[in-house]
Amino acid sequence: RSLRERFEEAFWCEDLSIYALALDGQKRPCRVKTSNAGHCLYTGIASDEHARRVAETLMSDELFSGWGVRTLADSERRYNPMSYHNGSIWPHDNAMIAVGLARYGLKSGVEKIMTGMFEVSLVLDFHRLPELFCGFVRRPGQGLTRYPVACNPQAWAAGSAFMALQACLGLSIIASEQKVVFNYPILPEFIDKMQIKNLKVGTASVDLLLRRHDLDVGITV
């Protein structure tokens, strides 16, 4: 059997609509709703049907706080929005989930994550994305709750915005053929126009102008 078949059999939790966090010492699934399941979309090992259901779970109120996807669902016994790994929100984790969603064509979730990241940046000093922040539910008129000892700046947090944007654009590069590919690009509502200048692919380079329309994104080279 293929790796995907064995993975699906071992990790899929039908009643939870998500992949198990791990297998214990007796190979029993740890039936916990976590953001880690989004990484299965990032790697491409998830089946199309299960990817769609995982996306719905990740975007539900259990896991999506309004600012981002929590590491642990608020319905879980160990949930603590101020815990380092049991309910906090990590920008790099969300960016990987966004790329995974884009891989399966689930762009509404990508836009939701990208918008959350952008709005997080608006309420923080220097508009920097931190290593992590607390997973309390978002409330109207209130900012997020910071994680007191989160590194800021931090490299993988800083790179998360670009990774999430890449997911929105469906952007990939085939260096051997000097190609830039956009797969069903979208731009979130807060971006009407975007310029990418001097994008280098091998020995070539290109300038791009992207404009958001009601139903699609126009690209001018």
Features from the language model and the residues they span:
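Extended glycan-interaction surfaces of carbohydrate-active proteins
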Residues: 2-89, 122-145, 163, 169, ...
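Glycine- and acidic
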Residues: 80, 94-99, 145-149
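Aromatic- and histidine-enriched alpha-helix N-cap/loop-to-helix transition segments
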Residues: 31-35, 85-96, 102, 152-159
